From Swiss-Prot:
Coiled-coil intervals, chain numbering: none
Any GO BP: 3-phenylpropionate catabolic process
UniProt-recorded name of the protein: 3-phenylpropionate-dihydrodiol/cinnamic acid-dihydrodiol dehydrogenase
Catalytic activity: 3-(cis-5,6-dihydroxycyclohexa-1,3-dien-1-yl)propanoate + NAD(+) = 3-(2,3-dihydroxyphenyl)propanoate + NADH + H(+); (2E)-3-(cis-5,6-dihydroxycyclohexa-1,3-dien-1-yl)prop-2-enoate + NAD(+) = (2E)-3-(2,3-dihydroxyphenyl)prop-2-enoate + NADH + H(+)
Organism: Escherichia coli O7:K1 (strain IAI39 / ExPEC)
Residues reported in the UniProt entry to bind substrate: 143
Amino acid sequence: MSDLHNESIFITGGGSGLGLALVERFIEEGAQVATLELSAAKVASLRQRFGEHILAVEGNVTCYADYQRALDQILTRSGKLDCFIGNAGIWDHNASLVNTPAETLETGFHELFNVNVLGYLLSAKACAPALIASEGSMIFTLSNAAWYPGGGGPLYTASKHAATGLIRQLAYELAPKVRVNGVGPCGMASDLRGPQALGQSETSIMQSLTPEKIAAILPLQFFPQPADFTGPYVMLASRRNNRALSGVMINADAGLAIRGIRHVAAGLDL
């Protein structure tokens, strides 16, 4: 039996991409899974696909009341919360400083930081009491942009660096009761969108990148699928497998940190 059997897991942005892969994986692990999802169509799809195995709540990650509403339903259903996974986010499609008009830069900043940083802060505030009671954990999705330049423009990169600082501070404030960690995936096949302020709300990441371009920059030389990144979340959520990690950022970058100067990888001809 999985360590996560009957554990209560709350995931944001569970309707597509990495969020959907996490929903699938934690249900496979036997957990009681809930998600807060902005899209009504995706909420309906989740309910149709997973039935009683999912509690799908329509809501906005920048709204504290929506977290409270979802938590009320989670606690009524499960009586507890063991792990919160802050996953919903938006990307800036590499919008650069020089090529972004000043007024758009300002409105784009507020929209992107509201989702990627304030959303995480509000979720932590809402979930902390239940997680303190269960001595559970929080996990937040980062990005390779939390470590390296070029994984987004200045807005996205700054937001992921801010999220890293938030994780460390929350880990400090909530210890010893709650473990707080992050997972930073590299580019993958997903429906990740951009800010409306930048005119990117209907543009997904795969409209800006191709599988070939993503695979080419990775030393492991493959095009990642969302399911490829679920393992670290399962490990961090497990009390048995993770008693000792808090304030840790797992860099799941398919080898970006070991790219060579002359070649992406030295073993391409092996």
